[in-house]
Structures are given as structure tokens and as C-alpha cells.
Amino acid sequence: MLLAVDIGNTNIVFGIFETSVAGETPRLLTHFRVETRKARTEDEYAAILATLLQLHGVPFCASTDPVAIAAEGAAVQALAGESAPLQPLSVQRHERGISAGILATVVPPVLSAFQRLFRRYLHIDPVVVGPGTRTGMPILYDNPREVGADRIINAVAAYERYRSGCIVVDFGTATTFDVVTPKGEYLGGAIAPGIGISADALFHAAAKLPRVELLRPRSVIGKNTVSSMQSGLVYGYVGLVDGIVERMRAEVDFPVRVIATGGLARLLGSDSRTIEECDEFLTLTGLRIIHERELRKGLRT
């Protein structure tokens, strides 16, 4: 199975995909997230990962033992929600445990810890998304190395889905907007402060304002401090998103589809005029696609 790891400023998201088979799209079997902490060692992250894999019924390391593979097959089908009778799985179809990995990060100090984790505990040399990685997407930025890996990964996944011009809105620590041309080129985008950063700024900078949970208020017109802050944050960010997307649409000479991802995509996307689809697993899907392209690249060399 493939372990995809998206290391963000706030959270690290893990996705487990079934082993890739020619002609089939591997399913995302399960996923989980932990808080990003720069000071954690590879041993600490390994302990957390091993525990979470166990809770999700995924063995930690790969095996080619037929009995173990059959047991892993049962776990895979259970994770996928299948109720059909279990059939023996071939060694080629599923390895027991994690047999491949791919990493992407916007937090360089954490990258080295995860590389050591993969090599020491999983005995895998993971693909690291960065300059030189075969994404299959030309980058039309002034300096392509300045574009965050997560933004390119999202763009790859969105273009693979639509095969047309598209805009990706990612609600992370920062809110990013990324435009892809109908030819599958990364055109550029915009970066705004994330809604969480704005909420924290209100709490820290205004002495009488409390910290509030990010929820959709009943009304735009708040009747108390908490609902007023929630209205300003939620609807203010919906307005920000719609405003930037509409300006981007007016600036390009091709139609675009708009997809949102990130932990708050569904909360904010439901009130947006411009967001057409929300997919919280878009980045994990992009990692899986790039891993497959790297595999094909390796087979040709």
C-alpha cells in the first residue's frame, strides 16, 4: 500500500491508498491527521504513525507472506466498506502493510524527520515532491521553485479530474488560489491569510474579543459578540474567495472549474457563489497521481 503524507504548517495529513494496478484507480482506504510539531523526532512520529495505522487496521511494514496478505486483504475490503465475500488476494495485488511512500511539505524542518522515519522504520526511500519531481505539469511562474509543493499537487489533481481550465482554492493555514490552463499548465495564483490566522489575530489584538469556534452563524447580522465575529470571519472569507475567483475568471481567456479543498472547504464552500465542488482529499489524490508518474518515470530509465 502507498502512504501519502501531506505536511502542512498546522496539520500533517496521512492517506493510505491500495496498491496501484494497471487500468484501475487505487482507492483511498483510510486517512488521519496529527498536529505538526517541528521539534518532534522521527522516533516520535513513527510511534504516532504506528499507533494510528494499528487503529485503522493497517500493518506497519510490508510482507510477502501469503497468509499475511490474505489477512491484509480482509482489512482492505473492510476499510473500503465492502460486504462481498472475501477472496484470496495475489501478492501482486496487495502487499501487507506500507510498501511505498510519498511526502510533500511546506515545513522543511519536518521533512528530514519523515525521510528518516521512512528509511529506518518502513525501509522505504519515499518520493519527495519538489524541484525535479515528475509532476507532468509545466509551471509558468517567474521562479518555479517559489511555488509551494502543496499548490502544485492540488493543481495536478484538479487538472486530472477536469482536463480543463480550473481554479483550486485551498483553505489551509494560508488560503491559496491556483489557476491551471486548459493545456494543463500551472499559471499562477494568489495567497491570502487563512481564516484561522484572522481569528487568532482578532483574539490577540482586541482585548475584549474572545476566541471563537469557526462555525456558520444563523444570520449575517450577529446578535452577540460571538455570532458577530463568526459572521465576519465566515462571510468575510466567503466574500474574499468569491471576489478573487471572479477577478481571476475575468483575467483569463478560458472557462474554469472551481474546486475547493482543505479542512474548512465545506464550511466556506457551501455559501460561496463560485466554488463548484469540495474535495477534502484533493491533495492526497494529487500525491498518489505524482507517485504513479514517478514510478512510470523509473520504469523507463
Predicted regions and their residues:
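Short glycine-aspartate micro-motif
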Residues: 2-6, 102, 166-170, 259
